[in-house]
Curated annotation (Swiss-Prot):
PANTHER family: SULFOQUINOVOSYL TRANSFERASE SQD2
Keywords: Exopolysaccharide synthesis, Glycosyltransferase, Transferase, Virulence
Gene from which the chain derives: gumH
UniProt EC number: 2.4.1.252
Biological classification of the source: Bacteria, Pseudomonadati, Pseudomonadota, Gammaproteobacteria, Lysobacterales
Name of this chain's protein: GDP-mannose:cellobiosyl-diphosphopolyprenol alpha-mannosyltransferase
The keyword Metal-binding appears for this protein: no
Reaction(s) the record says it catalyses: beta-D-Glc-(1->4)-alpha-D-Glc-di-trans,octa-cis-undecaprenyl diphosphate + GDP-alpha-D-mannose = alpha-D-Man-(1->3)-beta-D-Glc-(1->4)-alpha-D-Glc-1-di-trans,octa-cis-undecaprenyl diphosphate + GDP + H(+)
Keyword Transmembrane helix (UniProt): no
Biological processes per GO annotation: polysaccharide biosynthetic process
Length: 380
């Protein structure tokens, strides 16, 4: 069986969706006799002037890149039809042009397809009314072309249940590479919060600065590290926001750190903070917990579930910063007494997200789309 993953951004782009595709494809190929390939766009959205190689091998995976026109919100790339010609099954990632176009052209290409939702297109409030109309019409219609719609979180499952029949909807929560940062967090209690991920308004970074400002009135030892890559906030934007709040001595910025550099930053921190407005799943939070970082998270459904099930960390309302700072300070005081136990429990909880436990469910869906039984040895 040959599975071709179609995703708008992949290596060298870094992000949650890219990480999911890499791990599904890598685990599948490493543990079966199947062939797995990636089809993606030939430019990274954050550096559109640099055209990438048409073909590349990355971590043993064959990548084919195709050109596009239009915006990063809805990049138009009809040449995807040629790129999937050799596939037995096509696995789409995200609800975007590829999703709509491959559904529309299914009578031409005839490929069995599954799609993973990755939060749909509701990550920001941008054009929210138009998005709802699109979702209820075009997204609903396009879904009919897919053998399975795979919701990547319970939150997505609830959302897509509005437009997809229950018989064709499955929830398969993302796995996470829990070995990558395992145990890298600080081993002694302290007052350092770490955020890592995209520098985006959606991620609540300005509110995170306000939380730090409020926390400092309760304990002057608090520090914040913001690591990641520029998105709709750049380094100048963040430095300006930091200076406006007088936090220059309390915030460290690390732009585009390597994995090794991020591990070094984790070793300085006790807490992971993310005040996102929306997450399909929240991979970074799980990665942080695998490092032993205690989570400080916004009150969105995937984060509430993570904190509730793990029994670790604290959920805060980013619109009530003073109350949030009280909760964070109380958490830190409690952690002074039992930090090692909290750290250990946090790491133990996320072991369930290991990709080894997840990839078999995807392979089951590929076989279901093909109408072929899966043999016991499909995953070793």
């Amino acid at each position: 069986m040959k599975v071709v993953h179609v995703v708008r951004q992949f290596h060298p782009s870094i992000g949650g969706m890219e990480e999911v595709v890499l791990n599904v494809a890598r685990q599948h190929q490493a543990n079966s006799a199947d062939t797995v390939e990636i089809v993606t766009l030939d430019r990274v959205f954050t550096d559109p002037s640099a055209q990438l190689a048409q073909h590349e091998l990355h971590q043993g995976l064959s990548i084919t890149r195709i050109g596009y026109r239009g915006s990063s919100r809805y990049p138009i790339a009809p040449s995807v039809l040629g790129a999937i010609r050799s596939a037995d099954v096509v696995h789409l990632h995200g609800i975007d042009f590829f999703y709509d176009y491959l559904a529309l052209t299914k009578p031409l290409h005839g490929k069995p397809m599954v799609v993973s939702t990755h939060g749909g297109f509701f990550h920001t409030a941008y054009a929210s009314r138009m998005k709802q109309i699109w979702f209820q019409t075009l997204t609903r219609t396009s879904a009919l072309a897919y053998a399975r719609v795979i919701a990547t979180s319970e939150n997505d499952g609830d959302l897509f249940a509005k437009v997809v029949a229950p018989s064709r909807l499955r929830v398969i929560e993302n796995g996470v590479d829990v070995e990558k940062y395992a145990g890298q967090g600080a081993r002694a209690p302290g007052r350092t919060m770490l955020y890592f991920g995209r520098w985006s308004v959606n991620k609540g970074l300005i509110e995170t600065l306000e939380l730090l400002q409020a926390a400092l009135t309760r304990d002057p030892q608090w520090r914040l590290i913001i690591a990641g890559r520029e998105y709709d906030l750049n380094e100048a934007d963040l430095r300006k926001a930091i200076a406006e709040r007088g936090l220059q001595d309390k915030v460290q910025l690390s732009m585009s750190p390597s994995q090794q550099q991020l591990c070094a930053l984790m070793q300085q921190a006790q807490f992971f903070v993310c005040l996102s407005r929306h997450e399909g799943f929240g991979i970074a939070a799980v990665e942080a917990m695998s490092a032993g970082l205690i989570p400080i998270l916004s009150d969105i459904p995937p984060f509430v579930r993570l904190a509730t099930e793990s029994g670790q960390g604290v959920i805060v309302n980013r619109d009530r910063i003073q109350a949030a700072a009280d909760s964070v300070q109380a958490l830190a005081l409690q952690a002074n007494a039992d930090f090692d136990a909290r750290r250990t429990a946090t790491m133990a909880y996320v072991a369930r997200y290991d990709w080894r436990h997840v990839v078999g469910r995807y392979i089951d869906e590929y076989h279901a789309a093909l109408g072929t039984p899966r043999t016991q040895e499909a995953v070793r």
